[in-house]
A protein has these predicted regions:
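Metal-centered catalytic cores of metalloenzymes
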Residues: 2-71, 75-138
Length: 138
């Protein structure tokens, strides 16, 4: 009986560890109003983060922004500017999407643990400090 209980405990722990490392999708509603000197842009960001592989994939849809220059995930509560945690892209594009590799697992786990403490920020030439921003959520 003790052997069965131990085996069940091992399976439960292993299953829980695997679930914690699974890719997770987060979203953000982006708005220029969330930036101190942002534009009139709005849109959505959908990110899939995988702490096991260090891969972060993103698909950002924007309206009223034009060509973007860069996109990042920053640490910071709503209305608070914070440091970049993960750089998503840094080349001009009208349709930001793709994946970045080799991101720190610890940073990804922090984002997944408390997504509301992080935000997606999209930059343009006209708004280098941020054209649109949105807090991450499940």
């Amino acid at each position: 009986m003790a052997v069965l209980a131990s085996a069940a405990a091992v399976l439960t722990i292993a299953g829980g560890a695997g679930a914690a490392a699974a890719p997770t999708t987060l979203t953000a509603s982006l708005s220029g109003e969330a930036e101190p000197e942002g534009g009139q842009g709005s849109g959505t960001a959908r990110l899939t983060l995988d702490p096991a592989t260090g891969r972060v994939c993103f698909n950002i849809r924007l309206r009223g922004v034009g060509t973007t220059a860069a996109g990042h995930i920053h640490r910071g509560a709503e209305g608070v500017a914070g440091p970049v945690v993960i750089a998503l892209y840094g080349e001009p594009t009208r349709r930001p999407r793709g994946c970045v590799q080799d991101q720190p697992a610890a940073a990804i786990r922090q984002i997944l643990r408390r997504p509301g403490r992080f935000y997606v920020n999209v930059h343009t030439a006209a708004h280098p400090d941020g054209a649109a921003r949105g807090q991450l959520e499940r």
